[in-house]
Every structure is written in structure tokens, then in C-alpha cells.
Amino acid sequence: MSAQLGELGLTFGQRSVDGKSNEIPAVQALLKELDISGCMIVADALNCQKETARITIEGGGNYLLSVKDNQPTLKSDLEDYVQDLALRKNMDTETTIEKNRERIETRTAYVSEDVSWIPDKGSWENLSCFGAVHTQFVTFEKKTDEWHYYISSCPLTAKELLHHARTEWTVEAMHWLLDTHFSEDYCRVEDMTVQRNLNILRKCAINLIKQFKQKSSSKRPISNIMFDCLLDCSMLLTVTSCNY
């Protein structure tokens, strides 16, 4: 389980998940270890927990939590509110349209700071707003829709919600990079300590290459840069020393 800097997709902290437990206590322990003052903590639905919200606020940060079926009552309440057209028209709204290869992605965010009606609002530390993101994917063959709901301790605009919600996807992107470039899903190492160490080294390598790409404004794929580092020691030195 990792903590990432959303804007850059860089991993700056991680913690192992106990085999007899789950990710929730690991996330809470990691939040206590990190300096999160002034940070917006974006977490997936599994970590939409009241204790996680409390720890975040006590650490000086703010939270944006995705609300799904593990919080069924809260999700149902938010869904009923947002799907009421009369209520939705009074929410702050922002829409973006992007073309991704042969797919057009339209995202519309809705945000309201009126949390007075939420029955359990007192249980969520510093709850200040809620929102939803409606995503529509259009291809030549079909059109699909998705709704995602959020709560936050920080008063957000719809534009800010779209920005922060996108950072949640960087975690999935990192998993994809690790599997694509290091075949992590096919790793058969059984020793847990070795697994953790290899995972750290892989993420360090990805971090270094991302930093190099950012500082050099390189558009080259990560795989090409990795291959160059393998063949050229001077390139390897350039990439690994780009932060110094």
C-alpha cells in the first residue's frame, strides 16, 4: 500500500498490509507517520472511514474520500440528492471534454457545501462539502456512464473536485506501470521481505524516470528511457542524478 504525490504520480511512502488484516489500518498507520499538514488526502472507497478522516484532520490535512457501497447509507443519501434535478441545478458545476484515442470522455463535477441535511455528518470530522463526478465515455460502438460520489473536509469548487478526483487514478496508473515495465504481477518471489524490497526499488526507478522526464521535458516513453539506461552508463547516470 502506497502514498503518492498526485500531481507527479511519485511514490513517497508505503506500508505492508498484514496478511491477516486489510489495507484500512495500514493506511491509517501510514497517515500518522507522514507529515500531511496542508495536504489534500485523496483515498479510494475502501478507505472512506470515519477514523481515517479523523486521523487526517488531526495531522493537519484535508480529505477527499470516494463514497461507494461500503458506506451504503451515505452513498444512497448523496445519490438521492445529486439525482434530484431541482437540487442539482443549485450545485457548482464544471465540465471537461477530452479525446483519448478513439474515445471521447466527458466529465461533469457537481459540488455543494450544504451538508446540514446529511444525517451522520457529525461523525465525519470537519465535513464541509460533498460532490459527484459524472463520467461519460463515447466510442464508435457504445456510450457508457459512471457516477462517483465524494465527501471532503475542504470546501471545494467543482473544478477543484475534478482536479483532486483525477489524482486517485494515479495509483492505478502506478500499478499499471509496475506490471507493464517490471512484470510485477508475474513475480513469483515468495519471501515477503524480498517482495517489499523489490517493490520499493521498482517504484524508485519509476520515480527517477518521471523526474527526469519532467525536468528534461522529454516525451519519450518510460520503456525507451529504461532501455537506454541499460545500454548507456552515461544515460543511467543522467537519469539517476537528475534530482541532485
Task: Give the residues covered by each predicted segment.
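Conserved, well-structured functional cores that handle cations and Mg-NTP chemistry
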Residues: 1-43, 48-51, 217-221
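Short, conserved catalytic/metal-binding motifs centered on acidic residues
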Residues: 9, 27, 40-48, 63, ...
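A short, flexible helix-boundary coil/loop motif
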Residues: 91, 178-244
